Amino acid sequence: MSVLSPIRRTAMVLAAASTLGLLASPAHSQETPVKFQLDWRFEGPAALFLAPVAKGHFKAEKLDVTIDAGNGSGGTVTRVASGTYDMGFADLAALMEFHANNPTAPNKPVAVMMVYNNTPAAVLALKKSGIKTPADLNGKKLGAPVFDAGRKAWPIFAKANGIGNVAWTAMDPPLRETMLVRGDIDAITGFSFTSLLNLEARGVKTEDVVVLPYPAHGVKLYGNAIIVGEGFLKKNPEAVKAFLRGFTKGVKDVIADPKAGVALVKARDGIINADLELRRLKLALDASVLTPDARAEGFGAVSGPRLSLMASQVADAFATKERINPDAIWNGSFLPSATDRNIFATAKK
């Protein structure tokens, strides 16, 4: 039986330690999986989330991100709250409503980055209806799905514009614009960039449509934000910061080259009309992302007084069980620096 010399024994221990270190090192660079749900189908604006995946921005942040389509902001909020998804993209009013109506629910999602600084909600009518201003909506028949953001926020719009009684008709989303074209209703509410192009697809010329955007008529609600489940946020704060960094880089890519962004959407859902979705994306950027309010507040951030006003307006309009605490639904501490979030300096193609 041989006895190892102290020098040889030390060398073997060091070699073993080195080998173990090499074997263990991949664990330190392991990617954090993130399941993310959009608010809607894969349409033009989805490029904002598909770009950082395709461009490798999330990978560079050590994240393994999967993006799934949604079927409405309310559903996305609920699925993030249930833990089915870690993060999502949803209308801030829907998040506020969930908080106020489910005060004891565990894992309530929190908004960590504002993407649509101005709500895309709008009233749309055909010019031949004679509707030109909000006042013309008095006594008219309006239509929208019951969960539509514009319909739910209608009391805020009506109060701001002195509109009295209107009659509402509910329908599934695919029938909204069809019923307007048929004359079953006088006007609809919907996201401007969605309904305008849906009307065009049904043979209506853009110049024959009247669009009354909520933000242009006294309703300065925030739109869609990135939300995170409370549990995921507490367990993975650095991953959330990394996600927002990667996402912001992707937004800059899409602003610089919207056509390339839509190509990524087409790769994910081959049945889309790329030209139509390019227009939808550009409309969304102009109406909700690259806005004067977003420039003033900083992309991704919110204004405290404006957020508080919205919380009060939503609580009244939605008749929530409890009042809404804006501090409970918003956490801006995970945002990248203001310099990194300056998307307005991005050159466009």
Regions found by a protein language model. Name each.
Residues S2-L14:
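Bacterial N-terminal signal peptides that target proteins for export
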Residues Q30-R182, D186-F193, L212-Y214, V219-K220:
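Short, glycine-/small- and polar/acidic-enriched structural segments
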